[in-house]
Amino acid sequence: MTKTVEERERVVVRFAGDSGDGMQLAGSRFTDATAMMGNDLATLPNFPAEIRAPAGTLAGVSAFQIHFASRDILTPGDKPNVLVAMNPAALKANLPELDRGTTLILNEDAFNKRNLEKAGYAANPLEDGSLSAYRVHRIPMTSLTVRAVEGIEGASTRDAGRAKNLFALGVLSWLYGRPTDGTKKWIEKKFAGKPAVLLANLAAFNAGWSFGETTELLDVQYRVKPATDVPPGTYRNVNGTTALSLGLIAASVRSGLGLLLASYPITPASELLHELSRHASLGVKTIQAEDEIAAAGMALGAAFGGRLGVTATSGPGMDLKAETIGLAAALELPMIVVDVQRAGPSTGMPTKTEQSDLLMAVHGRHGESPLPVIAPSTPGGCFAAAFEAAQIAIRYRTPVILLSDSFLASSSEPWRVPVVGDLPSIDPAFAVAHDGEEFMPYARDELLARPWAIPGTPGLAHRIGGLEKADGTGNISYDGANHERMTELRAAKVDGIARDIPPLHVDAEPGARLLVLGWGSSEGTIRAGVRRAREAGHTVACAHLHHLNPFPVNTGQLAQLLRAKFLVDVESFCKVQGQPLFASEIEQQIAERQ
């Protein structure tokens, strides 16, 4: 049958189902196909903390949202235009967010009495008229998948049922004209060791595509043209974890230092350990430590031994690492601490995002121990942030804290791959012995950085430890005047990093008296909200901080720091729901202050 093709500038699609329905997989694969089409995109995975939450319940709903467009986009979208719901719970959990007219693609087979009761429905929403405000497409995905898999030798009924996410992916791939060859090759590679499962998933995907092509339910196919305002280069789809890993590896290559990551598993930082462990061929060493304190100690030991020492964690782990980070500040050794923030306090909501560790990163150590703090704002920007963290750590002989978050770590975007040889070199400038001269381990260069002496180097033996050091010699000292001088030197060294920080860019309009200022992963949302506010006639400026200590100068933490340092009036807008900010929320806050 002949179908109408309509063009769209942008679309937001959300896949939702049980945590065992493969929604993250389907969404990720749709994202890769979209990247190959040349669209700009941003994604937002959202899943429960449990490995397998109770099937069919609201608590067990897993979702993956992708916003793709023919122009530059800044966020994963506030709410979807299309919801793919694999069961009643997925529909009910997401329905409150949807606008009237949203397209619903529903797995009709799952709307049985048992699943409806689990989701808290007294009546079937497919039959009671409650969805009349939406464009509803009822598709028996499970039964059509089972039928497509029939006859495949070795494929069980369970294999057929589990492949329904690939059926849904096939339908959406047809609906938006996504290429299929890449997905088919991906299926063949992923299930190469299980021939029956491979054939079942291929059959399900092909059946979904064919259903879209032939059914009268879907009479329109949509086309989103490739983005045209993209600088030339080689691009890949990348999430924040992968970009951060590649940034650390690039810093290792450009400095000539071996990279060691020591971490204790903790959501959502564990993915960094998993990703870097895949790159042993590049000289990367990874250690899964027995606890957070041991992991920090291993990273610091690696730095003492002349490597690029890195440890990664999330909020609760930062509490445990604090003493070792303070030791690193006293030893003045280059070390990188990655904090992938999550909703807290305590265990909190491990898979939900939050920017709530700012004050801990800046001030969360006993004594006077200031450290540089960097926060990337986009998944691709995690590469540059990791590389810069290594530059600062090595150049200034200091631990550096890099604040990512769960949203940044798991969301993705097209990223232009840099040429490693074009990146600046990083000189470790290891200390060397000079005949007839006493080695002074706490002498200072023009940056106030001390020498980095590799253990075992003749003539460079020196004392380390947490006790205060005498200026220059590094001997243990309890002298009050010396302690004051060393405290001032360490602080001045960190303050001096500001000379390497570029001026803060302010996106201003003439006459603007309102500045929207943020940090971390809120940048895209802020820029999108400001864009909308300007289109509505408001005059507003925006700026974003990537360096939180020292300033190039969220919760209310950023406001506290700004008030304390600059004595300016700051109005804080905070959201503590485990989800990123929405552009519409920023737009509303601007309108209320005009």
Where would I find each of the regions flagged by the language model?
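Active-site cofactor/cluster-binding pocket
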Residues: 1-255
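Gly-rich Lys/Arg/Thr-decorated short loops/hinges at beta-loop-alpha junctions or inter-strand turns
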Residues: 10, 147-149, 218-233, 251-258, ...
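Thiamine diphosphate
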Residues: 10-99, 246, 259-260, 267-363, ...
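Peripheral docking tails and interdomain loops at the edges
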Residues: 19, 141-144, 150-155, 169-173, ...
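A glycine-rich phosphate-binding loop feature that marks nucleotide/adenosyl-phosphate handling sites
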Residues: 47-48, 187, 204, 225-229, ...
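Internal gly/pro-rich beta-alpha loop/helix module
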Residues: 135-180, 184-212, 381-394, 403-469
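Flexible, low-complexity linker and terminal segments
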Residues: 230, 237-247, 255, 385, ...
